[in-house]
Every structure is written in C-alpha cells, then in structure tokens.
Amino acid sequence: MLALVLLLQTGVAQPTARFDGGTFDPLVERGILEGAYPGAALVVGRRDRVLFAHGYGHLTWSASSPRVDPESTLYDLASLTKVIATTTSLMLLVDRGTVQLDAPVAAYVPEFDGPGTAGITVRHLLAHTSGLRADLPDAELKALRDSGALMRRVLGETPRVPPGRRVIYSDLNAIMLGEVVQRASSEPLDVFAARELFAPLGLRETRFRPPIRIRARIAPTGVWRGHAVAGVVNDASAFKLGGVSGNAGLFAGALDVARFAQFMLREGALPDGRQLVRAETVREFLKRAAAPERGTGAEARALGWQAVPTGETVSSAGTLLGPRSFGHTGWTGTSLWIDPDRNLFVVLLTNRAFAPRARRSFTALKTVRGQIADAAARASDAR
C-alpha cells in the first residue's frame, strides 16, 4: 500500500488540525463502521503537493478482499465524470474557439432544435439551467432498445421550464454535453479526453471502459447473482450508452483525481508551468453561473461544477470551505472539493453503492464528506 504522504511542520497546531491520520482516520473509519461503504481512498493536498494520502478498508465487506490503495484502486467516479471528463473537455474546446458557450446547442447537434430546445445554449447545459428534467426513469430506460434509441429520446426532450429560469440538476444536460464534445471534435468523448486531457496531465489510471485485466483492483458497485460487479459503469444511462457518456462512465484512482484537482488549482497549467487551458477560460467556467432559488434546496452552480452554498441540509462541502470553492459528488460514493482561497483540495472516493449496510448510507456519507472538508480547512488554517 502506498505510504502516507505527510507534510508536518513544527508549531503549536492542535492534534485535530493537522494533515495526518489522527485528524482523518477516525472520520473515514466511522463511515466503514456505520456500514456506509466497505472502503475508501482519501487524498488531501495543494496545487503543488500531496499532504495526506491513505486507503481505508477493503474493496468489499469481506476482509479477504484487497485493501484499498489510493494509487492503484480504481473507482467508478459516477457524476465526477461530468467535471473531470465532460466539463474539462468543453473547457478545452471553448479555449480553442471550437465551441462557444452562448451558442445554441443545435449549432453543434442540429437534431436538438425541437420545441423549447432550440433556445438552449451550451452555457445552459453546463449550468444545469436548460430546463430539462433530471433524468430518464428506470422504466423508460429499460424500454429503450439501444444507445441510439436513448439518444433520440434525449434529443427529443422538451424543457420542463424555459431555459435560464432555474437550476434543475440533470443527467440529460451532461449526456448532451458529451454529444457536443463528440460533434465538435469529430471523435468520441473518451478518445478526445484521453488524448487531450488525461495524457497531458499524467492521469494513467483514469479511463472509460476499463479492461477486464484490471478489474481485480476496481472497487465494485453492485452485486449480480451473488457476485460483486466491478469495472462496469453503475449508471443506467451510461451503461445503455456503452459505458461512455457525458454524465458517467469514468473510472480513476484517488491520486489521479488529486492530480486533476491540482490542475484546476493551477488554473489550467500543467506541472511544468505550460498552460493546457488559458487561466481566463478556467475562471470563466468557475464563475457563479446560477444561484439556488430560495426554498428549493437546489445548489449554486458554476459551469459544470457545484458551488457553495450547496443547498443541502447536510453539505458534502462542510461548513468552512471558502466562498469560491467548487466541487462535485458521484452517486457511487465519490467526491471532490476544491478551495482556491486556501489552495486546498479534498478527494474522497468510496464505493457506497456496493451493498451498503447502513440504512441511510447516502446521508451517512454526506456527513463524513462534510466532516473531512471541515477538518482539512481547519488543518490548512492552522499552518
């Protein structure tokens, strides 16, 4: 297992305000003890270094299954796909002038010009203000024969409210964004992202549709006929689309997600200082694009990213991250939060979706996420 990477300095910081196991171990292990997830990988750091990295528990509830390692254990990132692959691919295309944020989506996907959708822009999709419904219900998905039928259904959607009116967090927005990437770049999202983003960033453990040969080190997210299912995307829409979709399908290790977080903290710069994306383009994507309506419980949004306040009673971002913080979570049990004012990121990957023992595993995980974010903020402030 990868050794902990600790950056401890002399001083008077309290034990609860340090980047070490004394701070983080009880929080992550509590989630395992409560049955929210069988294992987890946590990485905390800054734009130029990792401050803490550790794996907890096992890939399944069996103690005989492999232990989690923050470098080699891969997780189904679920909706973290939206920000790591889809949003950032759009950021690259916008930066190059290939895609315009305020252009209608129909400029890139001509079929998306039905009643109500012709006025939806790329910015609307990224901010989740398109007015499209949240997703396709399971029964509706099952009735669709194949990926082509699913895309035709999405292309034929009618907004529930006029574009730009309010935030409706929607997988359909991300599916359409993946289609925009494919049409604008003339290649599938996974191919474009692998060459233009993952390779330059050195994300060697980040990919769609992981090969069978590495499935033994992928955290499972389901059970089929008594066997753990690993390496197959958990999201039903992404599965129907063949494992590559703008809303889900990406697999990665925690340290790769950390490298991506560092790229965002560097405002689009590679480790050697070269700009993969211009800083002004990154800043445009991180501006607050939509605020929650009072009383709706919806979250604030940047372009592609969740922002603070999150609109949650129990926030996955905790209570201490700065006002410019941005992040995202994934249904399978993944999360990433970045605080540019503190030069701080927190990556927590779990496989909560795998046979959780807790009755309310999602709520339990949100509590753990928030506590870890707050602990990281306190540790950062104490230095």
Regions from the PLM with identified roles:
Residues P115-R324:
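Short, surface-exposed loop or secondary-structure junction motifs
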